[in-house]
Amino acid sequence: MKKQSGMTLIEVMVALVVFALAGLAVMQATLQQTRQLGRMEEKTLASWLADNQLVQLRLENRWPALSWSETTLQAAGVSWHIRWQGVETDLPQLRALDVEVRHAKSDKTPVSSLRTYVTSP
């Protein structure tokens, strides 16, 4: 009797399951990386907007108010809500300036927030 060489149907099916699971793992990793890339792009843009607002406020050379001020603008095809306020410090001639960037005014947490310190003009 001759011995037949080759793979049985069960062996082929097990190999297909292994390759299918590996393919699913690769697809899931790629999807997660794509989502993270979008979030990173969003945070980078929000950080730039916060930095631009800080620079604009510094160039105005005004003492920051202790209440929130706000504006809405369009950047990269998206509407952004930016707000800022002065915060008292232990030194009367120094004030903290906080800037927060959100997608909407009603968002609970900002996408980006920055703080700098300004001296009395």
UniProtKB/Swiss-Prot annotation:
Record membrane topology: Single-pass membrane protein
UniProt keyword Transmembrane, yes or no: yes
Keyword Protein transport on entry: yes
Pfam family, one: N_methyl
Modified residues (N-methylmethionine): M7
Post-translational modification: Cleaved by prepilin peptidase.
Name of the protein described by the UniProt record: Type II secretion system protein I
Organism: Klebsiella pneumoniae
Gene name of this polypeptide: pulI
